[in-house]
Amino acid sequence: MAELTALYTLTAQMKREGICRLLVLSGEEGWCFDHALKLRDALPGDWLWISPQLDAENHCSPSALQTLLGREFRHAVFDARHGFDAAAFAALSGTLKAGSWLVLLLPVWEEWENQPDADSLRWSDCPDPIATPHFVQHLKRVLTADNDAILWRQNQPFSLAHFTPRTDWHPATGAPQPEQQQLLQQLLTMPPGVAAVTAARGRGKSALAGQLISRIAGSAIVTAPAKAATDVLAQFAGEKFRFIAPDALLASDEQADWLVVDEAAAIPAPLLHQLVSRFPRTLLTTTVQGYEGTGRGFLLKFCARFPHLHRFELQQPIRWAQGCPLEKMVSEALVFNDENFTHTPQGNIVISAFEQTLWRSEPETPLKVYQLLSGAHYRTLPLDLRRMMDAPGQHFLQAAGENEIAGALWLVDEGGLSQELSQAVWAGFRRPRGNLVAQSLAAHGSNPLAATLRGRRVSRIAVHPARQREGTGRQLIAGALQYTHDLDYLSVSFGYTGELWRFWQRCGFVLVRMGNHREASSGCYTAMALLPMSDAGKQLAEREHYRLRRDAQALAQWNGEMLPVDPLNDAILSDDDWLELAGFAFAHRPLLTSLGCLLRLLQTSELALPALRGRLQKNASDAQLCTTLKLSGRKMLLVRQREEAAQALFALNEVRTERLRDRITQWQFFH
């Protein structure tokens, strides 16, 4: 085939230039497969094949691709004929050696947007795959507008365009690149203070941080949201690498000459400020775009609090030439570019709502909204883009300035579960997909029917750093109330900080839940709050807030931190307590979900109850209790704790306990 000869010649040119390209094969399954095999046979390479089906020797499923990160391949096939895992696609593009092709297999071009996408099962909260027309149309726009991407469609004439030769590329040798070396010298001679290094993926910022640690005369501590993500840093730091998780570091009195925070944007600013203040020198690194998260907006906000912060940026890719067509195409397709943060929105702010259909008629607006949200929220992934475009029940508001988007709000429909399902969720018998806050209100709250109410959860909210402190966030929430009808509440779940809670409180939200353990990645407790919109919503918020006040002292003792509520000193078992205790004793409600009422039960009961008292009153560990009580493990300990709760309830009121037991055990049987 003349096409293959031309591709062979172009591949050699790409290798000299240090770039990769995308080649799309769109057509019927057999046609795509046959042409991919012909390419594999014509162009020598590894030909990693990413597909849910076992189509080739060097095969890997999209979900297992993470296990290959850090390795390099020449040429790969990404099979998206039945579903498009956007994160896997982006990750695969980053594993390719310079001079490689990424061959993308797609359905028949004209049929693609109406075809159910199997990947939607991961993010749509739907029981069956759904069509994803907005994402498909967006990707088609990007592919057809990209002069460097090659589109080969079945039953369409194909000719390979002529590509103007680029400058020859000189690959990295393993030593620090000139850009890295210059930055490294500046860091090594930096006076006490804070430095921040930002970079897109593949620019060597983790290697730079590791090289810094290996060369400093003193000691360093590394912290990050996840230790597994610091492997490259550890490799370059060598024996001087020492990792402590953010929450553990905050609780300790460890000292060092340097604190290195990898992917700092993933750590809440209040926690980061506390950590930074304890060390004479700090290096923060963060990704400004990529499939693993983005942090440009966070960094702008953080820099505002440190006016003397030293800012550096790595721009030169390590494993391919700058301006690589494949990297550029992936960035556009998955909206990794968050450069909007560099433009300050001007003029008066106007709040308006829009729905997903705007992706068809005016895609620039939702694109800018997504860029703002992803820049402000570090853990924004390609999966979030797909959800925003095509998942059911998504709603949006924008705060538009004259030239740019100044703020954005993303809301998700929740609740409306049947009475039977809500009761089963409350008892711990069922955990259906989605409904984050609605399910939590039932599973961790006092009302078995809480999930029957209909709410709308704040999934994301962001205001451009240059337009903050102007009330724009509150305007967006007020706009959500104005544009929302026939619902019981707005809800929000967030990592608790005093500053964040003051914002939600000013918006009218009522605190209804506080978690009982810190998230290791953030060092924060999870908080949930409601803004009632109906009488039923108001009753639910009042009931759960009252429960939180009753449990406040118990939670404060357990968490070691006071709650922002007025505690009630009430040791009497209420009707809600009896119901919750029966849910723990005879169903599957978790121990710590029932912390307050269990402690009140222990105050009321005269029985020994060693498994419960040992854990909740004496703070013995599960391992200690298993040894003392001669139990085989945590599961058996929990069984014993449930048995003890049942014994205590029967001792207090046998008839009432039997009635509650019979009622609750029926909740696991429904259609």
From Swiss-Prot:
Residues 356-531 form the N-acetyltransferase domain. The keyword Transferase applies. It catalyses: cytidine(34) in elongator tRNA(Met) + acetyl-CoA + ATP + H2O = N(4)-acetylcytidine(34) in elongator tRNA(Met) + ADP + phosphate + CoA + H(+). Acetyl-CoA binds at residues 461-463, 468-474, 499, 506. GO terms for molecular function: 18S rRNA cytidine N-acetyltransferase activity; ATP binding; tRNA binding; tRNA N4-acetyltransferase activity. One of its GO terms (cellular component) is cytoplasm. ATP binds at residues 180, 202-211, 319. Keywords: Acyltransferase, ATP-binding, Cytoplasm, Nucleotide-binding, RNA-binding, Transferase, tRNA processing, tRNA-binding. It is found in: Cytoplasm. Its EC number is 2.3.1.193. One of its GO terms (biological process) is tRNA wobble cytosine modification. InterPro entries: Acyl_CoA_acyltransferase (IPR016181), GNAT_dom (IPR000182), NAT10/TcmA_helicase (IPR007807), P-loop_NTPase (IPR027417), TmcA/NAT10/Kre33 (IPR032672), TmcA_C_sf (IPR038321), TmcA_N (IPR013562), TmcA_tRNA_bind (IPR033442). The keyword Cytoplasm applies. Belongs to the RNA cytidine acetyltransferase family. TmcA subfamily. Catalyzes the formation of N(4)-acetylcytidine (ac(4)C) at the wobble position of tRNA(Met), by using acetyl-CoA as an acetyl donor and ATP (or GTP). This is tRNA(Met) cytidine acetyltransferase TmcA. The lineage of its organism: Bacteria, Pseudomonadati, Pseudomonadota, Gammaproteobacteria, Enterobacterales.
